[in-house]
Each structure stands twice: as C-alpha cells, then as structure tokens.
Amino acid sequence: MEVNYFNQYKEETTQFEVILETVFKDIKEEKSMQVIFVDNDQIRDINKMYRNIDKPTDVISFPNDDEKDDSLGDIFISIDQAKIQALDYGHTLEREIGFLAVHGYLHLLGYDHHTEAEEKEMFTLQEEILNKANLKR
C-alpha cells in the first residue's frame, strides 16, 4: 500500500515513516492513504473543529468518501500524545506510533470499537499487523 507522509511536527519524523513503511509493506491495498504528523495543539484544533471535543487526542482518521479518488483517507497522529502514551504504557515510541497508524488505518477501512465485539475484532487485527512488523508490546 502506498502511504504518503506529511510532517507538520516541530521535529524530524523520518524515523517514524521508516517504521510505518515496515508496518504497511505487506498490506495488499490498491488505495493509498496519508499520514500527517502533528503536535497536540494542532490535533486539539482538529478535534475541536470536527468532533466538538476541546482537548488533544492521539489519532484522528478522516475516511475519503469520494469513490473516484484513490485514497482511503487521512490519518493525523499527534507525536506529543504518542510520547506521553508510550511512557504511560511502558513501550517504545515506535510501537505507539505504529499502533496509532494501524488504528487509524482500520478506522479508514470502517472498523470501529463502539461495542465489545467490535473492539475485540479491531484490536486483534491491530496486534496481528503490529506483530508482523515486530512491534510487539
């Protein structure tokens, strides 16, 4: 799958792009997607504008509804929030970025976690993809 990266974060993000290339390399998908790296202020603005929630979050996905377009959609990842969560969960920042990207990707495909069954299905798929990329907990 083709992934296009856009860095709107204050630091270099090439190392995360390399990791995500490994994560998504074996996924057979005809459509591309965009991953945009942002900070907490930027994702807070996006969260407020589109979800009416005035606080930062870790990842937000926007599926592309235009069937003529060859893009699944856009995934915004807050590097600031990923750093906090990696410390909280006791794993690497690389693993957290991978998790957030896969989580966002599955949302673009229509997966969700509103019910216990949906959450189990989504999180099982996430772990399978991350384990293949050797980003285990």
From Swiss-Prot:
<dbReference type="GO" id="GO:0004222">
    <property type="term" value="F:metalloendopeptidase activity"/>
</dbReference>
<comment type="function">
    <text>Single strand-specific metallo-endoribonuclease involved in late-stage 70S ribosome quality control and in maturation of the 3' terminus of the 16S rRNA.</text>
</comment>
<keyword id="KW-0255">Endonuclease</keyword>
<dbReference type="GO" id="GO:0005737">
    <property type="term" value="C:cytoplasm"/>
</dbReference>
<keyword id="KW-0862">Zinc</keyword>
<keyword id="KW-0378">Hydrolase</keyword>
<comment type="similarity">
    <text>Belongs to the endoribonuclease YbeY family.</text>
</comment>
<dbReference type="InterPro" id="IPR002036">
    <property type="entry name" value="YbeY"/>
</dbReference>
<keyword id="KW-0698">rRNA processing</keyword>
<dbReference type="InterPro" id="IPR020549">
    <property type="entry name" value="YbeY_CS"/>
</dbReference>
<dbReference type="Pfam" id="PF02130">
    <property type="entry name" value="YbeY"/>
</dbReference>
<dbReference type="GO" id="GO:0006364">
    <property type="term" value="P:rRNA processing"/>
</dbReference>
<feature type="binding site">
    <location>
        <position position="113"/>
    </location>
    <ligand>
        <name>Zn(2+)</name>
    </ligand>
</feature>
<keyword id="KW-0963">Cytoplasm</keyword>
<feature type="binding site">
    <location>
        <position position="103"/>
    </location>
    <ligand>
        <name>Zn(2+)</name>
    </ligand>
</feature>
<dbReference type="GO" id="GO:0008270">
    <property type="term" value="F:zinc ion binding"/>
</dbReference>
<keyword id="KW-0540">Nuclease</keyword>
<keyword id="KW-0479">Metal-binding</keyword>
<feature type="binding site">
    <location>
        <position position="107"/>
    </location>
    <ligand>
        <name>Zn(2+)</name>
    </ligand>
</feature>
<protein>
    <recommendedName>
        <fullName>Endoribonuclease YbeY</fullName>
        <ecNumber>3.1.-.-</ecNumber>
    </recommendedName>
</protein>
<dbReference type="GO" id="GO:0004521">
    <property type="term" value="F:RNA endonuclease activity"/>
</dbReference>
<keyword id="KW-0690">Ribosome biogenesis</keyword>
<dbReference type="InterPro" id="IPR023091">
    <property type="entry name" value="MetalPrtase_cat_dom_sf_prd"/>
</dbReference>
